[in-house]
Amino acid sequence: MEKKRNSTTKMRLTCAIIFIVFTYLYLSCYQPDLLAVAQHALSGGMTQYNYVLFPILTTLVLFLLQCGVFAITRVKKRFHALTYFPSLLILAIITDIPTDIDTYHSLGSWCWLFPLLLILYSGIMWVIRQLEAYEPDIQKGLWLSRCTWINVLSLDVMILLVILIGNGNDVFHYRMRMESLMCEGKYQEALEVGAQSAHTDSSLTMLRIACLHKTGAMGDKLFTYPLVGGSKAMIPDSVTTKSMMWTTPKWMRKKVRGKFYYVKPLDYQLNAFLLDKKIDQFVHLVQSKYNIENDSLPTHYKEALMLYTHRRLHPKVVYRNAVMEADFQDFQTLERKYPNAMERNAALRDTYGNTYWYYYLYGKE
């Protein structure tokens, strides 16, 4: 009898450790920013998410719920992992956060699916409880008992389902992480979020542009990121381009006679022309605001001026820079090397994907 009790205790302890570690790490490392925006949206911005307390308290509450389910069902053999089902179901629901939560506050299909699953679960657990008395005794294996392995695998399957149900949209995760950092004034750190990913949307583009403006690096770094939406993505429209937690600067919200009237900062104006590939307008503005012969001119402005000089038969401005000229010649040489359009695009993206030249000739607005 004592051996049986020790074996079931080890099995239950193993499951408890797996559940607690997963729940805490899942909430504190993978989903914290989505939970932050959910709380912000549901409270109308009146409350602030606590990144330290929420994962701890939620993990504790869900574990106590499992303890309660176990106390009621007393299922402690090969189906013990199912006592974690209600806790994992709730975890799945609170992390299944829609990307439009700022405008659509609803549990969606969970309104009827949650009670239905609990009813089915109750029936299944009742049947299991009746059959458990006829189960053979737990046989200890070389390391862990067979019963322990069955429960661990069952728990892993439910954990996998939680991960699949939770919001795993990488771009949405990037956006919410950036907004959290931007709310703290950490613009440089925000620029590192998703920097190696090729995935983006207009809202992420807008956030990166705002951070580059704050750090004074828009003219040097903008086209090192994947961009979509052209100049329209520079300012939120609350539909396709928006922020959920970060408060936009006042100049983006200024109204004149009921209509929005933007007085854009200079780097916004210049890069708006570049994003829309209007290099003639860009050249006209940049030469009136900068000494274009100065080596301190931002990198993308130099690239745009070099491109303009080469693509216009009678350029109004002839930009000369030996280093930039050599780079552009190498760019053109690589272009001519690949007759196949897909191979050419891939080769140029790998080597010059962080230049304005690549964006202008191959990028999408």
Spans of features found by a protein language model:
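Soluble catalytic regions of membrane-associated enzymes that act on cell-envelope
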Residues: G168-K289
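Aromatic-anchored segments of alpha-helical transmembrane domains
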Residues: F22-S28, P86-I97, D156-V162, Y338
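Membrane-interface anchoring determinants
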Residues: N6, R74, Q130-I150
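Membrane-interface segments at the starts/ends of alpha-helical transmembrane spans
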Residues: A41-Y51, Y104-W112, L142-S145
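Membrane-embedded alpha-helical segments of integral membrane proteins
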Residues: A81-Q139
